[in-house]
Amino acid sequence: MKTRNRKNGYSANTAKQYVDQKQAIHCLSTEFEAQIKFEDGQPTGEIIGHKAWFSQKGLPPFQVKFESEVTLPSYLAMVDFEGLEACEVGYNVYFRANNIKEIK
């Protein structure tokens, strides 16, 4: 049996199942990690995204991918995501967002 709402690819509903947008989310990264494109198991050197780590009370730290350049807030700053989506692959959940903003 499979869940009814599960679909392939990224979804905002999947992200809402894991991350509570009403609770504080903190930035754990001080700089982005570049995601390199691979072809035939070999890196091409082309950067296709940037990843950073975040934390929320009650959750393990999670990584969010940004496909465009965004400004990373300072360490432990409270943040909010624009367009947060998640994708379930096996037992892993992968997140991506369009933008990030610091909450003052």
Q: PLM ranges: what are they?
A:
Residues 1-104:
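OB-fold and OB-like single-stranded nucleic-acid-recognition modules
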